[in-house]
Amino acid sequence: MKLHLHPLSLVFFFFFFFFRPTMSSNQHDYSDALSKSILFFEGQRSGYLPNDQRMTWRRNSGLSDGWTHNIDLTGGYYDAGDNVKFNFPMAFTTTMLAWSVIEFGEFMPSSELRNSLVALRWSSNYLLKSVSQLPNRIFVQVGDPIADHNCWERPEDMDTPRTAYAVNAPNPASEVAGETTAALSAASIAFRSSDPGYSQTLLQNAVKTFQFADMYRGAYSSNDDIKNDVCPFYCDFNGFQDELLWGAAWLRKATGDESYLNYIESNREPFGANDNVDEFGWDNKVGGLNVLVSKEVIEGNMYNLEAYKASAESFMCSLVPESSGPHVEYTSAGLLYKPGGSQLQHATTISFLLLVYAQYLSRSSLSLNCGTLTVPPDYLRRLAKKQVDYILGNNPMGLSYMVGYGERYPKRIHHRGSSLPSIVDHPEAIRCKDGSVYFNSTEPNPNVLIGAVVGGPGEDDMYDDDRSDFRKSEPTTYINAPFVGVLAYFAANPGSS
């Protein structure tokens, strides 16, 4: 006999898991958080800033990027609190911004949908530049990370080498090219109605980028010419095969082409997509891949892809504490926890997948089957909402982990531009080591990076507002990007539970 997971039958469980005494139960302003989560990206911009730049303490930077290769590589985003443009996580950021618009754009106010598309275009434009010399060359990074991380200076003052790192055929860069394929494909869908010409350009470049990724299979971090500069920052720890499947899946979604359907069907097992199904982030795409492809099974009756749906359901069930089988770990206060730093990247990406899968199930009037449990879509939304509310302040610290949201939030984040005096207030350059005094200061950052979500607390739910503890205090673009979609949903459905 199946146990149906409904509030009336599990009152005690829901009360204990979702309303623990350590939590505040304040209602959050998800619309405000949504606006700020998008605004954050303006603080990460590289290149020439537009006249309507809202994060006004920032100025132009990285204006010579690409000149050593006689190519314009200006634009894009700095990944985190440094001044390097790492294409691997930037492409993932782009994919997730686009997916946020695709799945949840309908829930956004028109002004925030516009702002989301502006944020998306800022990175997709840069990625187009990075693949402009295909079929023989792809650019994967701009900025010497060793030199950059040895300095504490504003992006506007950068005097460290702005090395442009290229991978030339037949050397491989499958993980970066595969993720860039996904990013350009997803962006092409996001822009399809508002800018069809640009959408087509994105898609054409996605196709040729995938050809490079698949023809020259292998990891860019195994390339002797660049591996010491991409590792240990954004090494390919999980293998490149998941990015090939991920890129093909997005091309399938963008084109409807049967060849990509055949690719993801025939390569699932050879590429190991049945492993590590409970992971999703800038390095491991398997969790997101399974959810994305599941839509074809749930809504399109493509039962030849049933294995992807089975893995997606296994992942979803691992998030349900009452289900049998392996579970992901939660902190005592209910935050999704995985070993390593920057915990909130897991909370935002997995919350995104929970909401997307709940949407797929709801549209087909289905529930999730976890052994003897039948889990309705609203339960998945409840799990996601708990993560969101934790991030926004319902946690033992009583602290919002989004900068600028709520009354209490991190003031000493690990971020060069935010922690140094702005070029508006201090026009003179602050050179490499001269910024150390600001890094070591216990004073709050002078420039508020509104909307930035920091790495977050440890397994004990504790957080020290310490600039030097980058694992906890550093924001990243790939923490925020999926959070845009999550917040869009709850801004429109604040009572969803």
Swiss-Prot record:
Primary location: secreted
InterPro entries documented for this protein: 6-hairpin_glycosidase_sf, 6hp_glycosidase-like_sf, Glyco_hydro_9, Glyco_hydro_9_Asp/Glu_AS, Glyco_hydro_9_His_AS
Keywords linked to the UniProt accession: Carbohydrate metabolism, Cell wall biogenesis/degradation, Cellulose degradation, Glycoprotein, Glycosidase, Hydrolase, Polysaccharide degradation, Secreted, Signal
SUPFAM superfamilies in the cross-refs: Six-hairpin glycosidases
Active site residues per record: D82, H414, D465, E474
Record flagged with keyword Hydrolase: yes
Subcellular location: Secreted
Catalytic reaction list: Endohydrolysis of (1->4)-beta-D-glucosidic linkages in cellulose, lichenin and cereal beta-D-glucans
Keyword Amino-acid biosynthesis: no
UniProt GO MF annotations: cellulase activity
Signal peptide (from-to): 1-24
GO biological process, one term: cellulose catabolic process
E.C. number(s) listed in UniProt: 3.2.1.4
Enzyme class: hydrolase
GO cellular component: extracellular region
Glycosylated residues in this chain: N440
Family, per entry: Belongs to the glycosyl hydrolase 9 (cellulase E) family.
Protein name listed in UniProt: Endoglucanase 24
Source organism (scientific name): Arabidopsis thaliana
